[in-house]
Amino acid sequence: DFDDEAAVRGLLPRVVAHFGHLDAVVNSASLFEHDDAATFSFAALEKHLRSNTATPVLLAQALHQHVADRAAAGDADAQGAVVNLLDQKLWNQNPDFMSYTLSKAALEAAGTMLALALAPRVRVVGVAPGLTLTSHMLSDEKFTQLHALSPLGRSSTPEDVAATVKFALENQSITGTTLLVDRSQRLITVESDFSLMGARRLRTEQAPTP
C-alpha cells in the first residue's frame, strides 16, 4: 500500500530478509487518475505525490541505507542503483492529468537531488517512455494510431523500456539524468493526453448537430 508510509518503509527490509541483499530498485508503479485545472484539488495532488514521488524517494533512501550497511559489514564493492519511470509528457505538456504530471515532475527533480545525495554508493536514473501500453480508455485501433505518432514511425514498446532500464542499471557511468526512450514522440505536439484522445474524438463524433 503506497499510501501507507510504514508499509513503504518496511518493503525493502522485507525483500532483503527474503533474498539476502538487494542491488537495485525500479520504481515503475504509478497512480494515474485524471484531473485538470478545473477539477484539481489538494486531495488529488497529495494522493499522487504519495504514490508517485514520496514512495520512490523512500525506497531510494532505504536502498542507500542497505548498501551502506553492506559496506560497513565489509562489502567494499557494495553499490546500488535506482531507476525511476517517468513520462515523455514532462517534455511535451498538455493540461490533462495535472496531479499525475506534477508528481512525475517532482520525481524527475528528486532524481537529480538523490543522485547527488546518495553518491557514490547509489546511482539514480530516470527513464521516460512514450505511449507504450494501451488502456481501457483506448480502443485497439486508436492505440495503434496514436502509437504511430512519432518521427520514427512508432512510440516505445515494453521491450524498449526494459532494455533501457537494464542499460541504466548496468552502466556505472550514468546517474542524475533521464533517458528518454519515446522515439521522440515528445516532439509531436498534442492538445490532450494520448489516453483521452480516443474518448474525446468519440464524444465529438457522437455530439448532436445544433
Sequence positions of predicted segments:
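Conserved NAD(P)H cofactor-binding loop of Rossmann-fold oxidoreductase domains
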Residues: S28-H34, S184
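A short, exposed helix-loop element centered on a Lys and neighboring polar residues
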Residues: A60-Q61, T112
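Catalytic loop of short-chain dehydrogenase/reductase
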Residues: A68-A106, G111-A119, L131
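Substrate-binding pocket helix/loop in short-chain dehydrogenase/reductase
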Residues: D36-L49, L146
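Conserved Rossmann-fold SDR core element
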Residues: H21-D23, E108, A117-T132, I174-V181
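Rossmann-fold cofactor-recognition segment
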Residues: D1-E5
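C-terminal substrate-recognition "lid" of short-chain dehydrogenase/reductases
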Residues: E159-V181, R186-L187, S192-D193
